[in-house]
Amino acid sequence: MAIRPLQDRVIVKRLEEERKTASGIVIPDTAAEKPDQGEVIAVGPGKKDDNGKSIPLDVKVGDKVLFGKYAGQAVKVNGEEVLVLREDDILGIVEA
């Protein structure tokens, strides 16, 4: 099953965070916070303006993005959890 976002929605796969502290202590899944960074895996066509024309999104597939801790809706696609976010929920693009 594939998912195609509508309007200004973006599908993001969370990036895995390190499960150890700097001193080597392993953090269990139950205590670890969900990461607030992810990779964009799909983008919608954009919001429609008053004339019905789509306004393209600033993010594109492959971008690494930052988002709020409680942003978006988590869904499972092919057994993998992804987030459905509005472009407004994205705080910024991480540049290497």
Curated annotation (Swiss-Prot):
Keywords: Chaperone, Cytoplasm. It comes from the Bacteria. Heptamer of 7 subunits arranged in a ring. Interacts with the chaperonin GroEL. This is Co-chaperonin GroES. Belongs to the GroES chaperonin family. It is found in: Cytoplasm. One of its GO terms (cellular component) is cytoplasm. Together with the chaperonin GroEL, plays an essential role in assisting protein folding. The GroEL-GroES system forms a nano-cage that allows encapsulation of the non-native substrate proteins and provides a physical environment optimized to promote and accelerate protein folding. GroES binds to the apical surface of the GroEL ring, thereby capping the opening of the GroEL channel. It comes from Methylobacillus flagellatus (strain ATCC 51484 / DSM 6875 / VKM B-1610 / KT). One of its GO terms (biological process) is chaperone cofactor-dependent protein refolding.
